[in-house]
Amino acid sequence: GYVRYSNDGISYYKSNGKVIWNQTYSMQNPKVSICGNSIAVADINGSSAYSFNTSGQVGKADTSMPILQIEVSDNGKMAAVLDDNNANYINMYDTNGEKIYSVKTTLSGDGYPIDVSISPDAKKLIASFIRVSGDEIKTDVVFYNFSDVGKNETERVVGGFNYDDVIVGDVKFINDTMAVAVGENVVSIYKIKEYPSLEHTIKIDNEIERVFYSDQYIGLVLDNSESGDPYKLVVYNTSGKQVLDTTFSIQYTNVQFDGKSVIMSNASSFVLMNMRGKQLADISFDMPVIDVLPTGSRGVYTVVNSKYIQSIKLK
């Protein structure tokens, strides 16, 4: 299935376009997070967040402070970063919307949180904080543990890693024990069962334009404008091994994994590429397309535009 949302509400559809449920709300700036069968939508800079599963709404959290970011786990727990002027709070909410944890961070001590990610099992969280030290910009990547292990640690912090002169703008748990941090010129792969360890460091020479993930792969679209095709696509596995390095010229708007393939799409076309860089499909659309979604079935995709939903099957 897939989700559609706006300032007025959110709906969940089967892949054939049938509405399963819809929920109305009023938000100025809604943002959605999805993990497995769980969905969260929050009003960024507002104070409300809803959690859903494929059957409908399961909870609502009302915060006393503006929401900066929302994340949801596979079991429906929500993590929200809240703004309190000179401090921030990372709150965890149960599926029913009740607050179960709260971690306070300060701008003067920890820095400003630019990205967070919760593990699918909701037991761990990675956050990236940016701070200025003299003339230098520094990023700290911090791990929190919300299981029994974290109870004995200050603010549940179980590890931290420093990046000098690098902004780490993207952090992501790709499964329960692996997390990735992407900086301007570096990709770090961390392993965390209870405490984190840095497993692999990958240096990136070109400017990173887009990062995308699956539970097996890390994909980067890089600027390649100085040599041939305008873009370079590189893919790494969780062991830090490069499994794809190719260039392309498609003016993509969306890029994502579908198993061991990569989908690149824009309003008028859709390209499917395997991990050898071979194009398996190149399809043009008559009407502008909003998105192309994998269905979980090999070679079957849902095409969404403003007027209809269509299922396509590749030969």
Go through the PLM ranges and name each one:
Residues 8-11, 47-51, 87-92, 133-145, ...:
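Structural motif
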Residues 26-37, 65-74, 109-117, 160-174, ...:
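Repeated scaffold domains used in trafficking and secretory/extracellular systems
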Residues 14-16, 53-56, 93-98, 146-149, ...:
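Short loop/turn segments that connect beta-strands within beta-propeller blades
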Residues 16-24, 56-62, 99-106, 152-162, ...:
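A short beta-strand motif characteristic of beta-propeller blades
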Residues 19-128:
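Non-cytosolic head/periplasmic domains of membrane-anchored proteins
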Residues 2, 39, 78-79, 122-125, ...:
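Hydrophobic beta-strand positions that form the internal "hydrophobic ladder"
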Residues 190-285:
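Intrinsically disordered, low-complexity segments enriched in Gly and acidic/Ser/Thr residues
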Residues 104-106, 110-226, 232:
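Acidic, serine/threonine- and glycine-rich low-complexity intrinsically disordered segments
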